[in-house]
Amino acid sequence: MANGKYAARKLKQDRQKHRWSDSDYARRARGLGKKSDPLEGAPQGRGIVLEKVGIEAKQPNSAIRKCVRVQLIKNGKQVTAFCPGDGAISFIDEHDEVTIAGIGGAKGRAMGDLSGVNYKVEKVNGVSLIELVRGNAEKPVR
């Protein structure tokens, strides 16, 4: 390895070459995160509810977390989204239009005991799901 007085260019070239061994760098440089992301890099996305599903929590927890299968409008991809709040699933029906966002897990992945669920429902037919759960708003009839 070059260590001399005028070795800066060689040191820089070697560093740039070996950076590609780091999988995080390689994914970032090639934009693979955005390519594989159903929302295509956007912070939120709209979709149509296909069905309600109950997903079992991972060990040591024991629960059935209420989620929905959503087909995104922009590209037709299907994702599972969590419905946060007590009784929130009752405000969501099939064929409703929902707005989803990332659930906030580490490195943009799943959160807590919900494996494979990377998104949460934020709005139902344009009304905030939290407002519906609290009783501050009513769901509009479509």
From Swiss-Prot:
Residues 1-44 are annotated as: Disordered. Keywords: Ribonucleoprotein, Ribosomal protein, RNA-binding, rRNA-binding. This is Small ribosomal subunit protein uS12. Gene3D superfamilies: Nucleic acid-binding proteins. It holds the Pfam family Ribosom_S12_S23. It comes from the Archaea. GO terms for cellular component: small ribosomal subunit. InterPro entries: NA-bd_OB-fold, Ribosomal_uS12, Ribosomal_uS12_arc, Ribosomal_uS12_euk/arc. NCBIfam families: PRK04211.1 (NF003254), uS12_E_A (TIGR00982). GO terms for biological process: translation. Disulfide bonds: none annotated. Residues 11-27 have a biased composition (Basic and acidic residues). It comes from Natronomonas pharaonis (strain ATCC 35678 / DSM 2160 / CIP 103997 / JCM 8858 / NBRC 14720 / NCIMB 2260 / Gabara) (Halobacterium pharaonis). Belongs to the universal ribosomal protein uS12 family. GO terms for molecular function: rRNA binding; structural constituent of ribosome. With S4 and S5 plays an important role in translational accuracy. Located at the interface of the 30S and 50S subunits. Part of the 30S ribosomal subunit.
